[in-house]
Amino acid sequence: MAQTSAERGLAVYEAHCSSCHSPDANGDGPAHRGVVGRRAGALKDFDYSPALRNSKILWTRATLKAWLTNPEALIPGQGMDYQLDDAGDREDVVAYLATLKRPRAR
């Protein structure tokens, strides 16, 4: 059975992103659960760069793909020095990130 884009994205995420990020815990980078639809720099418990915190970017599939293509071009002065060179990998990682929904409030 062929893998879905999100399944491929999980594999790419684990290989290229998980040394700094995870779905639920901050590391060198912020946690990703609920990132699609969230404002950049919005997690209160993560120390973002001033450029990212003040960017007013909304993380959509399109802005996340632009970010993964070249973070510095999207938000000059941000702190992430990594990008995904393969467009398919970017598409798949964004598909995976979109599966990481925020838990519903009780």
Identify what each model region corresponds to.
Residues 60-106:
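C-terminal capping alpha-helices of c-type cytochrome domains
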Residues 25, 36-40, 69:
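A generic structural signal for secondary-structure junctions
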Residues 45-65:
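Short Fe-S-cluster ligation motifs
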Residues 4-27, 32:
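Sequence/structural segment immediately N-terminal to covalent heme-attachment motifs in c-type
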Residues 18, 22-23, 33, 46, ...:
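Mobile acidic interaction elements
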Residues 6-7, 30-50:
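Short glycine/threonine-rich turn/loop motifs
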Residues 6, 10, 25, 57, ...:
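Solvent-exposed, acidic/flexible segments
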